[in-house]
Structure formats: C-alpha cells, structure tokens
Swiss-Prot record:
The UniProt record lists the keyword Coiled coil: no
GO cellular component terms, A-Z: bacterial nucleoid; cytoplasm
Protein name: Recombination-associated protein RdgC
Main location, first listed in the record: cytoplasm
Function: May be involved in recombination.
Subcellular location: Cytoplasm, Nucleoid
GO molecular function terms noted in the UniProt entry: double-stranded DNA binding
C-alpha cells in the first residue's frame, strides 16, 4: 500500500458526479503505457492495486489513484557532443556553415538515434479523493508535481474545480504562539526541528535537533521571527512537518499504527492493501479535521 509521505490538500469547489464504471472509463482515456523507442516521456494512470485492471481503488467514499510518469534520460552533454561532431563533419564535407534550421534538424536526428538506448526515470504520484469531505490529497513534495497529477485528472474527467486548502488563521502566527507561549495543543507534541523567518531581508534560520523551548529560540521569537515550518508528532499515529502554506511534508506513520494489520497474511495482498488504505485515510481524515479546528477552520473563498 502507498503510505503517503507528503500531503498537498485541495478543496473540491463542486462535487464530482461519477460512478465506478464512469470513473474507470474516464481514467482509461489517459492510461499509462511504457515509452516506445521514439518517446521522450509518458504520463498516465496505472493500477493502484497490482494484479487488477482497475485504474482506481475504492473503499466506501475514499478513492485512490496512481499517476505514473516515465521520462527518458538523455544527458545534455551526450547530445551536445554527438551534435557537434555531426555539425563539424557536415560543414567540412560541404565547405560551409550550417544554418540554424539545419542544426536543429541534426539535433532532432541525434535525439532520435539516442532515445532507444536511453535509460528511463519512473515516478509515481498517489492521489486520494475523499468524496465524503470533498477533498483531494496528493502525495507530492512540490506544487509542480501535485499540479501535474491534478492536470492529468482534469484531462481525464473533463473538469476538476479545486483550490488549495487554506486555514482561516495564518499558520505561521499560530505555530509561533504555540512555541512562544508553550501552548501547543494537547494532542500534538513539537519535535526538535523548525524554520524561522522574519522580514524578507532577515534571512531564514533552520533548526534541527534543537530544543524549541531554549533561550536561543525564545530570543529569536521575541525579536520578531515567525515559525514557518514546525516538526510535530501526533502520539502513536504519525509525525510530520507543518508548513505555513498548509502543506505537510515528511509524514512518518508510527510503527504501532502500521503494524495494526499485521494479523492479515502477507499472501492476502489485496486484503492488506484494503485494510492499510482504510487505516491511513482514517488517520489523515482526523488529522485534517484537527488541524482545521486548531487554525480556525477553512479560509473563506472570495
């Protein structure tokens, strides 16, 4: 099962109307197929649960999708070396300088020649659609990767009205108060990692293995620094980095949580996949609800 390592959360501004069959049909329009010899890249949906033909995995009102991107790796210096050699030979042969359009045509030939021998870089991005709460969670550490996956879903469905989830109260202000006033919510425990910043000219201070209750940190906060990233733990469930933009990074689920389904035989892969998905989505749904409560709910959209 794909245990999410990062969370970028999006609000569906309009409910999606689909059935399991219509969703499968829509996803098949953008199904992933491996690169052929002449392909630079391929991007599409693959099976979340291996061994099945379904391009989505559903339990109740929770849906899991898996986007697969394959990119051929052609080092620029390899292309450049081969291209320069060909240009030199042709210019000597014809005793003239090649035009720009001719050089581009040669470059295209070089790329076509090298592609079949190029290695592939494969990357998968998981998306979880919570149709009950109208949220989409993307396991991505960068906005571009998340937006690429959402664009693929939008292409498959025809439309996808989403906006990033935002809290009503500024996370940096609230997180700073937690540490400055020693008032972290009872269900959360601050760990020894944070990032602080002030004005644009004051730079960024990154703290690791640092007691956030220390005099050094208090001095920085009293001087007007704000906490923009904070490492937190939810006891017996998971730890994560909470960012000021409402994204979560470096999710690490507690061993005692991940072991809850160990009574299911390893041979029964589908049942374990199902149970782990239910477990993970249950924890993250509650985490989202808790964070929304701590930060004053969801920011009103204009």
């Amino acid at each position: 099962m794909v245990w999410f390592k990062n969370l970028m959360i999006y609000r569906l501004t309009k409910a999606l109307d689909w059935t399991a069959d219509s969703l499968q049909t829509a996803l098949q329009q953008c199904e992933y197929h491996p690169c052929q010899q002449s392909d630079m890249s391929k991007f599409g949906w693959t099976n979340p649960l291996r061994g099945t033909e379904m391009l989505h995995f559903s339990v109740g009102k929770q849906i899991l999708l898996l986007a697969h991107k394959e990119e051929k790796i052609l080092p620029a210096h390899v292309v450049k070396a081969e291209l320069e050699q060909r240009i030199e030979l042709l210019e000597q042969k014809e005793n003239r300088k090649l035009k720009k359009v001719e050089k581009q045509a040669l470059k295209d030939d070089v790329v076509s020649m090298l592609l079949p021998r190029a290695f592939s870089k494969n990357q998968q991005t998981a998306l979880w659609i919570d149709t009950e709460n109208q949220l989409i969670y993307v396991d991505a550490a960068s906005s571009k990767r998340a937006e690429d996956a959402l664009a693929l879903l939008r292409k498959s469905l025809g439309s996808l009205p989403v906006v990033p989830l935002s809290f009503a109260n500024e996370p940096s202000v609230i997180m700073t108060d937690w540490i400055n006033k020693d008032q972290t919510p009872a269900w959360l425990m601050p760990l020894e990692e944070a990032e602080l910043t002030g004005s644009q000219d004051s730079g960024i201070i990154r703290c690791k293995q640092q007691n956030l209750e220390s005099d050094e940190i208090q001095t920085l906060l009293n001087a007007g620094k704000f906490i923009t990233k904070l490492s937190l733990a939810w006891e017996e469930r998971l730890s994560f980095i909470l960012n000021e933009d409402c994204t979560l990074k470096r999710l690490k689920f507690a061993d005692q949580l991940r072991e809850k389904n160990d009574d299911i035989l390893k041979e029964d892969y589908a049942q374990r996949f199902d149970a782990d998905f239910v477990l993970m989505t249950g924890v993250l749904t509650q985490l989202t609800a808790n964070l929304l409560e701590e930060f004053g709910g969801e920011k009103a959209r204009l």
